[in-house]
UniProtKB/Swiss-Prot annotation:
PANTHER family (alphabetical): TWO-COMPONENT RESPONSE REGULATOR, TWO-COMPONENT RESPONSE REGULATOR-LIKE APRR8-RELATED
Region annotation (Disordered) ranges: 158-213, 227-259, 282-312
Name the record gives this protein: Putative two-component response regulator-like APRR8
Compositionally biased region (Basic and acidic residues): 189-212, 236-257
UniProt similarity note: Belongs to the ARR-like family.
GO cellular component: nucleus
SUPFAM superfamilies xref list: CheY-like
Chief localization: nucleus
GO BP terms, alphabetized: cytokinin-activated signaling pathway; phosphorelay signal transduction system; regulation of DNA-templated transcription
Keywords from the named record: Coiled coil, Nucleus, Transcription, Transcription regulation, Two-component regulatory system
Name of the coding gene: APRR8
Amino acid sequence: MENTEETERFSNDICVLLLDSDATCLANLSEMIRKCGYKVVATTRADDLPLIINNKDKKIDLVLAEFRLIEMNKYELLEKIRSICEIPVVVSGAHVKDAIVECLCRGAKLCLEKPLMENDFKILWQFTVSRQRNFRSQIDINPPEKNHSITHTQSLGAELKKNNNNSEVETEDLDKYKDELGQGNKRKERADTDTGEHTEKNNGSDLGDQKKPKLLFADDLQNETLEAVPNIEEANNERKAPTEIKKNGESSEKKSPELVCMEEELQKWSAESFIDLTASVENESQDPLESVGDSVGPHEIPLSPPESSNNNVAAQLQMPTHEALDEEVMQDGLSLSDLEVDLQEGHGSNKELFDKIFTDLAKELKP
């Protein structure tokens, strides 16, 4: 720790009592303590401590004593100093580490191990300052009581009197205002004998003038609004139309769309297509048969009328060949190739065949 100005200021007023049984060590320590700015009182005898401490000429602020003395035990010195007065004691020695806790419990403020250095003495003033502060705090705990008196000057009394008069005036005005307010809230009804109408009379006419005026919509502003929006009346009428219908009790339910029967439409479509197909078949049946010798080779078989008519019908229906149709089977287990064979053999009439085809199609398309 550096020797600051604050350390020098406090150390100049502190007197240290140095106690050591070795005279050489005592002289060296005294020199180092004086260099730090302390006043030193040195002795080698522990029996001289009471005389030195009680001496009024030199006030002792701190005791720096060796831990092991010849005349006394290591703890007897602390107990003796504590019995005389409350002075901070700093203990020094070569083997002080073993008894630091015991020394602190018996009243020691600090334990220093030898050899001592100059920096060890620069912090001694802190123990004396803390002791002085504790002593002053004990003195100021119960300060003497002082008799305090309050004197009112003439200006203060006049001001208080003026404030009292103003408060009385304010209370009178407040009472008057409450009375007027109570009268204004009272309304009386009177009946006109001629017309039989009831009118209200307000006793507090002044309070009625203070009411908030009503907001009126000017005619000029309304006309300008109607000119700016010419269709506003029509929009209002359209908006009121549903409410008027609802008030009159008329039903405003929307009509549900008509349902279309798919089966009837399918039968109608099948009948029309059947008529067209029968007409085309009859026209082809009236054509002359193809000649065998002219258009057919020696190893070719001429087409018979049923075969040519069946092929034309299949082409009009845009149906695939029997090889691809054999893979597709109808719901009743009958393939289109079987129907073609029946046509070639002449089983059944064309009308029955087409009726069967369209009924099967109707079953598949029926939802």
